[in-house]
Design a protein with these regions (language model features):
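Sec-dependent signal peptide recognition
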Residues: 1-7
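Beta-propeller folds
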Residues: 18-299
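Hydrophobic h-region of N-terminal signal peptides that target proteins for export
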Residues: 9-17
Length: 299
């Protein structure tokens, strides 16, 4: 089913509240949902939930004092974050829309410095920095696509790797178009500028990169709605189904690569009962084994 995405003419979630609570307000009695150290280990970033709000807090690791962060408008929430370098973080919002009981993402990426300065919407439908009524074009346009990050690119302090799932216009709105190839781009986390890396030929592709930021595996959906996975040893090589490359089941989903880059974790059915579990496949030694065995259920 194609989900219609109406154009949202609303104030961005980056806007400040009229009377925002200080970030220290969320430090006491909060539930910490995610915690991550900065690359140097000197700072701690965390999503904190208190009284229905989810904010991003940055603390000094030694003193535990709040030194920065950001909080969205009252009904929105910080849904994920990642350190890009020692000073800047990339994050996503989950927004509360009228008539909905649940927050949902608009497929947009944001960035902010650890101290809360220089917040910006980097990529997504509303990421244009063009100004209404101006004769001068902006330096970037909004993406007619849903955007998500696929690699932090640890050796590059200024860029991350993203994937864009294009929309098509339907009347006054836009909807996801599964016929258009997903676009992989390198995104500058300071300027928002993008450079296309490649276009994947797979529908609803979920790519997986190695430690060098190269896409090696991809899981995708066929026109029949089936999940398949493919592999390539490098960018110049052709994609191969898992059955052709390693004699594995094609309906396994790719979960992640190990740090060494010589083994992949896969998710799929196991045993006569068909309980789904995680497998580890060493594609250099050709060893394939489940991580969890003796699976059972009493439902």
């Amino acid at each position: 089913m194609r989900v219609l995405l109406l154009i949202v003419f609303a104030v961005s979630s980056m806007a400040a509240q009229a009377n925002p609570q200080p970030l220290e307000y969320f430090l006491k009695d909060s539930d910490y949902l995610d915690v991550a150290l900065s690359p140097s280990g000197e700072r701690i970033a965390a999503r904190a939930q208190f009284d229905g709000k989810v904010v991003l807090i940055v603390m000094d690791r030694e003193t535990k004092k709040i030194i920065g962060g950001i909080q969205p408008e009252s009904d929105d929430a910080i849904s994920s974050f990642n350190w890009v370098n020692e000073d800047r973080l990339v994050f996503t919002y989950a927004q509360q829309f009228f008539g909905s009981d649940q927050r949902s993402s608009m497929g947009e990426l944001y960035a902010v410095n650890f101290d809360g300065s220089d917040p910006d919407m980097l990529a997504g439908f509303r990421a244009s920095n063009e100004r209404a009524g101006s004769r001068l074009g902006g330096t970037r346009k909004g993406d007619r696509a849903a955007v998500s990050m696929i690699d932090i690119l640890e050796d590059d302090e200024d860029h991350i790797l993203i994937i864009k799932f294009p929309f098509s216009q339907q009347g006054f709105g836009y909807s996801f178009d599964g016929k258009k190839p997903p676009i992989v781009s390198k995104l500058n986390v300071n300027s928002g500028k993008q450079k296309t890396v490649e276009r994947l030929k797979f529908r609803s592709a979920r790519p997986l990169t190695d430690k060098n930021g190269e896409i090696r595996f991809v899981s995708y959906q066929t026109e029949d709605g089936l999940t398949k996975s493919a592999y390539r040893p490098n960018k110049k090589a052709d994609w191969q189904l898992l059955s052709d490359a390693f004699e594995l089941d094609d309906d396994l989903s790719v979960v992640g690569l190990n740090d060494a880059g010589n083994a992949v974790f896969l998710y799929g059915p196991h045993g006569e009962e068909g309980f789904r579990t995680v497998f580890r496949f060493d594609f250099e030694e050709n060893i394939y084994e489940p991580l969890f065995t003796d699976l059972d259920a009493d439902i």
